[in-house]
């Protein structure tokens, strides 16, 4: 069959986590991960926590919100869900993103504390079928056609990461313990 990218599973994952934990998704993420690893600039709805002057605009939305999106999620599904979703809406800086990638690269451990089982990280960072290079949660390098790969030519098969529509990219190379984070606002002012 034909491969088509979809992030709807992560939209539903938010609801599943909320139902199982009886906690809002943003509180769950903050209390389970971000606060515990010192990712103090990572949050949903950043205008409630971070000064607008420290947030880059992501786009001008001429259709739906008719405003410059600064501190507001770009993704329309996440926006309709109030800005907190499993597929989009998380704001951060490079240092905090690197902390999360370090946690993934180190089998779910950060600063001597265990957060995620290695088997879960392996499941989300492995290719899930032969027709595309994506895993359940992360992208993989395209080793057959490096011109189409989201990673550099020297990326190993073990590397994984994800790029965002608005211009963010985080990549992890477990083979040589390297993390790459690039944050931009490529969709501003026009997509």
What are these regions (language model features)?
Residues 159, 166-179:
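Short, surface-exposed beta-strand/loop micro-motifs that present aromatic residues
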Residues 186-189:
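A short acidic/small-residue loop/turn micro-motif
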